[in-house]
UniProtKB/Swiss-Prot annotation:
Subcellular location, principal: nucleus
Coiled-coil region: 261-312
Name of the protein in question: Cohesin subunit scc-3
Family: Belongs to the SCC3 family.
Assembly description: Component of the cohesin complex, composed of the smc-1 and smc-3 heterodimer attached via their hinge domain, scc-1 which links them, and scc-3. Interacts with scc-1, smc-1 and tim-1.
Reported consequences of knocking out the gene: RNAi-mediated knockdown results in embryonic lethality. RNAi-mediated knockdown from early in larval development results in sterile, uncoordinated (Unc), and protruding vulva phenotypes, in abnormal embryonic cell nuclei morphology and in defects in the mitotic and meiotic cells of gonads. RNAi-mediated knockdown results in somatic gonad cell division defects with a reduced number of pi uterine cells at the early- to mid-L4 larval stage. RNAi-mediated knockdown results in chromosome segregation defects in early embryos with lagging chromosomes at the anaphase phase of mitosis.
Single annotated GO MF: chromatin binding
Function: Component of the cohesin complex, a complex required for the cohesion of sister chromatids after DNA replication. The cohesin complex apparently forms a large proteinaceous ring within which sister chromatids can be trapped. At anaphase, the scc-1 subunit of the complex is cleaved and dissociates from chromatin, allowing sister chromatids to segregate. The cohesin complex may also play a role in spindle pole assembly during mitosis. Plays an essential role in cell division during embryonic development.
Keywords: Cell cycle, Cell division, Chromosome, Coiled coil, Mitosis, Nucleus
Residue span(s) of domain SCD: 320-405
Compositional bias annotation for Polar residues: 1-21, 1060-1073
Pfam families documented for this protein: HEAT_SCC3-SA, SCD, STAG
Lineage of the organism: Eukaryota, Metazoa, Ecdysozoa, Nematoda, Chromadorea
Length: 1096
C-alpha cells in the first residue's frame, strides 16, 4: 500500500516570475462601505439578489486579472508562485500550465461527494485528492470544482478543459443551465439520510485547509481558484449555488482564521527565539547562522500570515458583505454565526467597529434565528476583559435595541438576550439603568421556565452575589439577602404567587433554600418585620418547601424532560427533603402559635408539614415537637371558622394519621378532637328539637357543623353515626341567618358519607352483603329525595344540591353493574323531571346571569369560578356516561355566545364526546343547530342574510373541527349529520300548495359540513337528498335556492369552492354532476371501489 500523500507542491514549470492575485487591491473595489461612517445604517437591502454596483462589475474585475502577467514581482522565499486567477464575476488570467493527455479526461468527484454525504473517511478522501493534485494538478482542480457544484445538487459536469479554458463566470452559467428543477431540495437543506451533510461539509473543508496549510495553501493555482469560484457561486441567482457557496466560503474563512492564529503564534515564538539569539551575539562578533535562519523564518511566517489575511478580507468583502442580507434566512444565519466565531477566536483582528456593525444591523432582522445568532456572537466577547474598550462604542450605539430584545417574540432570542445582559452588567455595572432592568425583573414571572431562570440568574448577579450555602442553622450573612428577596417580591408587585419567583431562583440561588434563616427572621422579634413582610416571607418559605420536597415546578412551568430523574437529581431531592424536615420540625409549632390569629399566614404554615419525612418524628427528641404541633392544630380548630383553613388542618390530620409510622401517636388525639365536635352537634340538635337554641347556641352549632364538614372530606365519620342527625338538619333547620351554611355543609357531609359507605362495601369482599346494599340504597334514596326537592323548589342550598345530584348520578351510575351483580339495585336512573331541573338551574344561574358587570373584580372572579364549576359538573355527567351524548346539546348551543368564559370546557366536552361515539356526536351537533334554527324561526322568521342566521352558520363552521381531520374515521358521523339535516329541511312539507318548506334554509347551514364527506359518501348523500326531494316534493319543477346551494356543495369540486355565501354561487345541476366514486386519488392505482356509506 502506498503511503499517505504528503502536502508538497507538484513538480511543474516554475511560475516564480508571475504575480499572484493581490487580494487587497481586489477587495478595495468592493470596499465601498469602508468610507462610510461607522455603524451607519445599511443601504437598501440586497436580499433580492440585485446586481452589484459598477465599481465591482465582473467585467472590470476580469480585466484587472487579465493584465496580471504584465507585472513582474520579485520571487518570495520558500514556495513556488502561481499565476493570478481571475474573478468569479469576470475573466481570469491565463495560467501557465503543463498540459498532458491524462489531464483531458473527465474528472470523477464521486469519492469526495460520497465522503461528505456519508461522513465516513473524509480525511482519507482529502489525502487521496492531495495525491492526485501532486500528480495531475489540473485534473484535481477540476475535480474540486466539480465537487462544489455536485454538493449543491447540480448534475452538470466540469471537465479539465472547461476548468482550464473557461472563465469562472462561464462555468457557473453553464452549470446553471444544467441545474434541474427537481434538484431544488439540495443537500445542504435536505433532511433524511442527508441531514448531516452540513456538518460533514464543514469537517471536509476544515480538513482540507489543515492538510494543505504547510505549502499547498499558498499555491495560487489552488486557493485563488477556490476563492474566485466560490465568490461567483455565492453571487448566483440559483439558491442552491448561493447557499452552498456561502456556507463553504464562510467555513473556509473560519479555517483560514485558525491558520492565521497558528501563524501568529509561531511568529511570536520565533521572535522570542530571535531575542534570545541577539543576547548571545552581544559577546560574539562573528555571524550567527541560526539567527539569520530565524529572521528568515519570521519573515516567511509574516508573509504567509499577511497573504491569508488578504484572502480572509477578500472573502469577507466579496461574500459576507453581500450575503449577510440575503433573502434566505439561513444564509444570513451562516454569515452571522461565522462572524461571531471569528470574533471569538481572533478578537485582535475582528473585534473592531467595522465588523461589529454587521452584528448590530442584523439584530433588527425579521427572523428570530438571525437575531439569536447575533446575541450568541456577542456573549463570549464581553467575557474577554482585554477587548472591552473596543466594545464600548458598539454597546452605547445598540443598547436600546438590546433592551428591546429582552421581550423578543422569539423565546430563544429573548433567553439569550437576558444572558447577554447578565454578562454586560458584570463588565459594565453602571451601563444599565433601572428602566433597562425592569423588563428583566418582569421576566422572572414569565410562563416560559428557561426564560424565567435566565432572568433569575441576572437577579442573582445583581443582588445575591454574596449568598452563602445554607445549612441547618441560620446564616447571619444571608439575613439581609433574604430580606432583599422578600422586598423584591413585595415591591415588584408583578405577580401574587411567590411560587414563580422561587422556581426562577430555585436552581441558581441558595437563598430560597435557606429555611433556617427564614425561620429565624419570622420567630425573632428583634428584626421588627411588618405583617405584610411576614406574610410574603412565609409564602416564599412555603413555596420553597413544596418545590424542594416534590421537585415539581409551578403550574404552567412544566419541565420538558424525557425519562426519569437522574441519580443526582433524585439524591438532591432526598437530601433537601431531609434537611428541610430537620430544620422546620422545631420551628413550625412555634410559628403556628405566633401567627395563630392570621388566616393567610396559618394556611401556608399548615401546608408545610405535608412535605416532611414523617419518620423523623419517631425519634424521642422530635416526638415533643409532634405533640406541640397537635396542640397548635387544636387551637386553630377552636379559634377559626374559615373554610379553607379548616380544610387545611383536616388534611394535615389525615396526612399524619394515614402514615403508618406515626399514626399511633396521632390517632388518639384526632379521635378525642372529633368526639368533642360530634358530642356538641348532638347536644345542639337536642336543644333545637326542644326549641331551646338561642343566638349564641345557634352560632356555636353552625361553627361545629363547619368543623365537622371540613373533616368529612378527608376521613370516614361513620364511627360517630351522624347520618340521621344530618338528615334532620337538612329537612327541619329553618333559621334564616344560618340556614344556607348549615344545609349546604350537611348535604356535603351526607354525600361524603355515602361515598365512604360505597367504598367500604366494595372493599369488604367480592360479593357485598344484601343487608349492606339495602342500607346503602336506603341512605341513597333519602339523600336523593332531599336534594331533588331542594333543586325543584330552589330552596336554600340549591347550589350544593345541584352539585350533589350530579355526583350521585356518577357515583351510582350503570358502571356498578359491571363491578358486581349485587350492586345493581344501587343504580340510579333519574327521571326527565330531574334532568330538566338540572338544565333549568344551569340556565338561571349560569347562562342567563347578566349582572356580572356591576360586581367588583374580586366578586366577579368568585362568581365566575362558581359558574365554571356548575358547567363542568354538567359536562362530567356526559363524559362519565351518566347522561347520553345528545344531552351535550344544552351546552354546545352556547359554544359561540359563551366561548370566552367556558370555551375550554366546551372543547374538552366535544373531544370526549367524539371518543364516546362519532355518530352520536354528529347527531348531537345537528340537533344543536336544529334547536337554534327553530328558535330563530319562532322569534323573527328565517332570513338567511340576517345576523342571527349567520351566527348559526358560524357556529356550524366552528363545530366542524370537532370531527377531527381523519375523514375516513368519522365518515358515518358526518353522513348521519347530513341525513338529519335533510330530514329536518323537508319536514312537514305540504306538496299541495308548493310552498317552500319552512326549514329548507337549514340546508345552507349543513353546507359547512359538506367538505368533511368523502367523495363516495357525497354520492350517497346526493341519492338520499334526491329520494327525499322526489318523495316529498313530487314532480314540482320548482327548485329552491337553498336546495341548489346544498346540492352544489356535494358536487365533486375542491372544498375551497364550497362557498357559504349566497351571492356569486354557480350551482351544478344534478344531471351534470360528475361521478368520482371510481376515480383514483393520490399516488398509485386505485385499490378497488370503497364501500359507500349506507344509503340511510
Amino acid at each position: 500500500m502506498s503511503e499517505t500523500p504528503t502536502d508538497q507542491s507538484p513538480q511543474r514549470m516554475s511560475t516564480r516570475n508571475q504575480a499572484r492575485v493581490n487580494y487587497t487591491d481586489m477587495a478595495a473595489g468592493n470596499n465601498s462601505v469602508e468610507k462610510e461612517p461607522v455603524f451607519r445604517s445599511p443601504t437598501a437591502s440586497t436580499r433580492g439578489r440585485k446586481k452589484r454596483a459598477a465599481n465591482v462589475d465582473v467585467a472590470d474585475l476580469s480585466a484587472s486579472f487579465g493584465n496580471l502577467n504584465n507585472f513582474s514581482t520579485p520571487p518570495k522565499r520558500g514556495r513556488p508562485r502561481g499565476g493570478g486567477l481571475g474573478s468569479a464575476r469576470g475573466g481570469r488570467a491565463p495560467m501557465v500550465r503543463r498540459t498532458t493527455t491524462e489531464e483531458s479526461a473527465e474528472v470523477d468527484d464521486r469519492e469526495l461527494v460520497a465522503a461528505v454525504k456519508s461522513g465516513k473517511k473524509i480525511t482519507e478522501a482529502v489525502d487521496r485528492w492531495i495525491g492526485r493534485y501532486n500528480e495531475k494538478f489540473l485534473v484535481a482542480i477540476a475535480e474540486m470544482h466539480q465537487f462544489f457544484f455536485a454538493i449543491c445538487g447540480c448534475k452538470g459536469i466540469v471537465t479539465p478543459q472547461m476548468s482550464a479554458t473557461l472563465t469562472y463566470k462561464d462555468i457557473i452559467c453553464r452549470m446553471t443551465e444544467d441545474f434541474e428543477e427537481d434538484s431544488a431540495d439540495y443537500p445542504l437543506v435536505h433532511g433524511g439520510s442527508l441531514k448531516k451533510v452540513r456538518a460533514n461539509l464543514h469537517n471536509f473543508i476544515h480538513t482540507l485547509i489543515i492538510r494543505t496549510k504547510a505549502s499547498m495553501l499558498f499555491d495560487s493555482n489552488l486557493m485563488d481558484g477556490f476563492v474566485q469560484l466560490l465568490t461567483g457561486m455565492a453571487d448566483s441567482q440559483v439558491r442552491a449555488f448561493r447557499h452552498t457557496a456561502t456556507f463553504c466560503a464562510m467555513k473556509i474563512t473560519s479555517a483560514l482564521v485558525d491558520v492565521t492564529i497558528e501563524l501568529t503564534q509561531s511568529k511570536e515564538k520565533t521572535s522570542k527565539q530571535i531575542e534570545a539569539e541577539k543576547a548571545k551575539l552581544k559577546n560574539n562578533s562573528a555571524g550567527n547562522e541560526k539567527y539569520e535562519a530565524l529572521v528568515a523564518q519570521r519573515t516567511q511566517t509574516e508573509e504567509r500570515a499577511e497573504e491569508i489575511r488578504q484572502i480572509i478580507g477578500y472573502l469577507f468583502r466579496s461574500v459576507f458583505v453581500h450575503r449577510y442580507r440575503d433573502v434566505v434566512p439561513d444564509i444570513r444565519c451562516i454569515c452571522i454565526q461565522e462572524l461571531g466565531h471569528w470574533m471569538d477566536v481572533y478578537p485582535e483582528h475582528f473585534v473592531e467597529d467595522s465588523y461589529l456593525k454587521y452584528i448590530g444591523w442584523s439584530m433588527f432582522d425579521k427572523v428570530g434565528d438571525v437575531r439569536q445568532r447575533c446575541i450568541r456572537a456577542l456573549i463570549p466577547l464581553f467575557e474577554k476583559t482585554l477587548i472591552l474598550d473596543k466594545l464600548e462604542l458598539f454597546v452605547n450605539k445598540f443598547k436600546d435595541r438590546l433592551v428591546s430584545m429582552l421581550l423578543d417574540k422569539d423565546l430563544e432570542t429573548s433567553i439569550e438576550t437576558v444572558h447577554l445582559m447578565r454578562v454586560l452588567y458584570t463588565v459594565f455595572p453602571t451601563l444599565l439603568t433601572i428602566k433597562d432592568v425592569v423588563p428583566i425583573y418582569e421576566l422572572i414571572y414569565a410562563s416560559n421556565r428557561p426564560l424565567a431562570v435566565a432572568a433569575g440568574m441576572f437577579l442573582n448577579t445583581k443582588v445575591f452575589r454574596s449568598a452563602e450555602k445554607p445549612g441547618k442553622a441560620p446564616t447571619a450573612a444571608n439575613i439581609p439577602l433574604v430580606k432583599d428577596l422578600t422586598t423584591f417580591f413585595i415591591e415588584g408587585d408583578l405577580h401574587q404567587h411567590a411560587t414563580y419567583l422561587v422556581d426562577a431562583l430555585f436552581e441558581s440561588n441558595p437563598i430560597v433554600k435557606d429555611w433556617a434563616t427564614m425561620g429565624e427572621l419570622l420567630i425573632n422579634d428583634q428584626y421588627q418585620l411588618d405583617s405584610n413582610f411576614e406574610t410574603k416571607l412565609i409564602e416564599i418559605l412555603t413555596c420553597s418547601v413544596v418545590q424542594s420536597a416534590t421537585g415539581e415546578p409551578p403550574v404552567g412551568r412544566h419541565i420538558v424532560k424525557k425519562g426519569a430523574p437522574s441519580a443526582k437529581e433524585s439524591r438532591d431531592l432526598v437530601e433537601d427533603r431531609q434537611r428541610l424536615t430537620e430544620t422546620l420540625i422545631p420551628l413550625i409549632p412555634r410559628l403556628i402559635t405566633k401567627f395563630s390569629s392570621d388566616n393567610e399566614k396559618i394556611i401556608n404554615l399548615v401546608n408545610i408539614p405535608l412535605h416532611f419525612q414523617l419518620e423523623t418524628y419517631l425519634s424521642a427528641r422530635m416526638q415533643t415537637h409532634l405533640m406541640e404541633l397537635m396542640e397548635g392544630l387544636d387551637s386553630l380548630i377552636e379559634k377559626h371558622l374559615d373554610e379553607e383553613l379548616l380544610k387545611a388542618v383536616a388534611e394535615l390530620y389525615y396526612h399524619l394519621t394515614t402514615n403508618s409510622s406515626i399514626s399511633a401517636l396521632v390517632e388518639g388525639h384526632k379521635m378525642k378532637l372529633l368526639d368533642g365536635v360530634a358530642a356538641f352537634i348532638r347536644k345542639s340538635m337536642q336543644q333545637f328539637d326542644d326549641d331551646q337554641m338561642g343566638e349564641e347556641e345557634e352560632a356555636l352549632f353552625v361553627s361545629y357543623i363547619k368543623r365537622m364538614a371540613a373533616f368529612a372530606g378527608f376521613m370516614d365519620l361513620r364511627h360517630w353515626d351522624l347520618w340521621d342527625i344530618l338528615l334532620k338538619v337538612v329537612s327541619n333547620y329553618t333559621r334564616e341567618d344560618t340556614q344556607r351554611d348549615v344545609r349546604e355543609r350537611s348535604m356535603q357531609m351526607l354525600f361524603m358519607q355515602l361515598c365512604f359507605d360505597s367504598m367500604n362495601i366494595k372493599k369488604e369482599g367480592e360479593t357485598p352483603k344484601a343487608d349492606q346494599v339495602r342500607k346503602l340504597k336506603k341512605r341513597r334514596d333519602q339523600l336523593i329525595r332531599i336534594v331533588t326537592e331542594t333543586l325543584n323548589e330552589e330552596a336554600c342550598g340549591v347550589e350544593q344540591a345541584y352539585l350533589v345530584i350530579c355526583d350521585l348520578m356518577i357515583l351510582f351510575g350503570s358502571q356498578l353493574a359491571e363491578e358486581s351483580k349485587a350492586l345493581e339495585p344501587l343504580i340510579w336512573r333519574p327521571d326527565a323531571m330531574v334532568l330538566g331541573n338540572l338544565k333549568i338551574f344551569l340556565d338561571v344561574n349560569v347562562f342567563d346571569v347578566s349582572n356580572l358587570d356591576d360586581m367588583d373584580q374580586q366578586e366577579k372572579i368568585e362568581v365566575m369560578h362558581k359558574m365554571r364549576q356548575h358547567v363542568a359538573q354538567y359536562a362530567k355527567l356526559i363524559i362519565h356516561g351518566a347522561m347520553p351524548v345528545a344531552e351535550a346539546s344544552h351546552l354546545i348551543k352556547r359554544y359561540q355566545s359563551h366561548f370566552q368564559d367556558f370555551g375550554d370546557i366546551f372543547k374538552n366536552l366535544l373531544s370526549k364526546c367524539r371518543e364516546i361515539s362519532f355518530v352520536e356526536t354528529g347527531v348531537m351537533i345537528c340537533e344543536t343547530l336544529k334547536t337554534l334554527y327553530s328558535q330563530l324561526d319562532e322569534d323573527q322568521g328565517t332570513d338567511p342574510l340576517s345576523e342571527s342566521f349567520n351566527s348559526i352558520r358560524d357556529l356550524a363552521k366552528r363545530l366542524g373541527p370537532a370531527f377531527g381531520v381523519d375523514y375516513a374515521k368519522n365518515r358515518f358521523a358526518i353522513s348521519s349529520l347530513h341525513k338529519k339535516a335533510i330530514d329536518f329541511a323537508f319536514e312537514e312539507y305540504d306538496k299541495e300548495n308548493h310552498q317552500m318548506p319552512k326549514n329548507i334554509f337549514f340546508l345552507e347551514i349543513a353546507i359547512e359540513f359538506s367538505g368533511k364527506l368523502l367523495a363516495q359518501d357525497k354520492m350517497a348523500v346526493v341519492r338520499y337528498l334526491n329520494k327525499i326531494y322526489t318523495n316529498r316534493v313530487g314532480t314540482s319543477t320548482v327548485v329552491w335556492e337553498p336546495y341548489r346551494l346544498y346540492l352544489g356543495s356535494l358536487s365533486d369540486r375542491n372544498d375551497d369552492d364550497n362557498m357559504s355565501v349566497r351571492s356569486g354561487m354557480t350551482v351544478t345541476s344534478n344531471a351534470t354532476m360528475r361521478s368520482t366514486a371510481s376515480s383514483t386519488r393520490g399516488r398509485g392505482r386505485g385499490r378497488g371501489r370503497s364501500r359507500i356509506a349506507d344509503d340511510f
